């Protein structure tokens, strides 16, 4: 009889890399910097005229973007991503959120911040999150408390921090941008 020996190569376990770096895991989200894109959906790849970016949201996420700025409108009886004029480019919000879900499924140690410039209601927006099976990932930050670390958000499966410039705070997980951060006019 012949005996076959199978040797398995063992390597030391890789440290967690929260948003691409093990150094970020213990950092609170408000102590972290993320790369973001403005009008993230407006890309050549997605057919927007004029585009802000060459690549669409899936490639942006693969390239390290963790902050998405999205403009939403109601068009064709659904929540759409548009850059002002929907006739010059649009994408169903649920499709973009499905891309985000696919990315989070592939990269479970990522946290993404989404900021909406919304011309639709909080309920319409959150319905798209529910349809894309992402609503449970939305983090709701209690006021007057410290922000959690990235690893805490990851372990709690709350890997989406969602803000809105209007109508935020009306639905859990869809937070008011101006309650939580400051912006300048430039």
Residues of each region from the PLM?
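Sec-dependent signal peptide recognition
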Residues: 1-7
